[in-house]
Amino acid sequence: MQIKDISHLYNIIKTFLLYGIDEALPQHRYTRAIRCWRKTLFWLRNQHKDKTFGLRLRLALQELGPVWIKLGQMLSTRRDLFPPDIADELALLQDQVDPFDGKIARAQIEKALGAPLETWFDEFNETALASASIAQVHTAKFKQNAPHLENRLAGKEVVLKVLRPNIQQMINADLSLMYKVASWIPRIKAEGRRLRPVEVVREYEKNLRDELDLRREMANAIQLRANFENSPMLYIPEMYKQFCHQTVIVMERIYGIPVSNIEELHANGTNMKLLAERGVQVFFTQVFRDSFFHADMHPGNIFVNRAHPDDPQYIGIDCGIVGRLNDHDKRYLAESFVAFFNRDYRRVAEMHVASGWTPKDTNIDDFEQAFREVCEPIFAKPLSEISFGHVLLNLFNVAREYNMEVQPQLVLLQKTLLYIEGLGRQLYPQLDLWDTAKPFLQKWLDEQMGIKAFTKSVKQKLPYWREHLVDLPENVMDALAQQKIIADELIHLNRTLAKKRNIPHFTSFILGLCTGLAIWLLIYLLS
């Protein structure tokens, strides 16, 4: 280990000790050594005893910087690993850091594009428009006579997003340490194996390295834009593919009212009721129609088009984090909500076990009662005031007590849903979430489980059956003929063995074995 690595490790341990994170460690010979270091090597005491553990953990990760902030954000989606209060605190981590030098950004962009910025752009602003842990953005304009540029783009305002320099080395150093810590956890904590810490770090590394290739964000934006092409509900800025690379992407610059600026939205004459309802509609359209949703829809990434305020349209930016759902996920989501609002907790419990996410030996009666105790108080509110996000959160928390491994994509969806609901009620406090969302849930369930869905499934399988039904009579006759031969042989064998009365148990065994083989062979021939 080099001197700089030792120094880096020292700073990380020191930060965790300052916030008393070591207090969460169980009594063990390894952890006793850590507590001894606090007094001898570091001369530190917990300076934040008045704060909750979740808050202390969040502050420590925030102080450690970008890589640790992103780790905390990822861990907040793993509610099978942490109690709700800690997961909620981690979800508050903000991915905001000081910008790096604009001249360095210019050099990075020119290296990626392979030519000076002046080749294609005018008015490049070296002062960053915004800055985060992985990248920052700058503004510019396309030149009027830039080479190989479509005429429609001449003079158009753009945003350039560029990765931070040396981010790869920073990530490698921190990941190496995270893997070491993860490998220790099963040794010092009885529950460590269930938590699978090395797998958690591996999942985090994959997500983080995905973010280091900005072409993924470009691809996400292109797909979302295509999904909502010509939609009055949502607009996604255009990506300019010829200028997009691993470390730089270039996109259309948009101007809109920040969705959090309620005063300006009112001043612009925005239909707030319709705007709030469209937020919910956009979300459920992404989930149930497209199986692909923008998963970072906090207020900083959402704007409202200034044009036609009576028919308001959202503008979404920063598509770096998206969620994908399969039919199994969508069925869980739709059936969970429908069963919950019907107060059918038995169905909720059975569904969790049937999905395979909760152990098969789970006691359904106890599981049902646990859901009832947690969810029933929610109905003290009017139906219109119930939060879908909190319903999901309650379901996850109960399931966690029964060893359910909560799927990350569903927790990502739950967090996004909370954003959307909070935003909707901020825009229009009387928003009825259930009334707005119910048509999407019902339509999807009808499409998947109704008569039309059955007819569609039959049509899809007809070519297979048409091909194989032709041979079915011949296969059946062959199988019956083979069965007759086998039956005759069994009768003969039975008579022979019956004569050997000194080995009755062996006889029974052979007869059973042969009968079993005959049945297996018949099934095999028929298939």
UniProtKB/Swiss-Prot annotation:
EC number: 2.7.-.-
Binding-site residues, ATP: 129-137, 161
Membrane topology, from the record: Single-pass membrane protein
Cell location: Cell inner membrane
One Gene Ontology biological process: regulation of ubiquinone biosynthetic process
Top EC class, one word: transferase
Residues of the active site: 296 (proton acceptor)
SUPFAM superfamilies: Protein kinase-like (PK-like)
InterPro entries in alphabetical order: ABC1_dom (IPR004147), Kinase-like_dom_sf (IPR011009), UbiB (IPR010232), UbiB_bact (IPR045308), UbiB_kinase (IPR050154)
Residues covered by the Protein kinase domain: 123-527
Transmembrane intervals: 506-526
Entry keyword set: ATP-binding, Cell inner membrane, Cell membrane, Kinase, Membrane, Nucleotide-binding, Transferase, Transmembrane, Transmembrane helix, Ubiquinone biosynthesis
Descriptive protein name: Probable protein kinase UbiB
Gene this chain is encoded by: ubiB
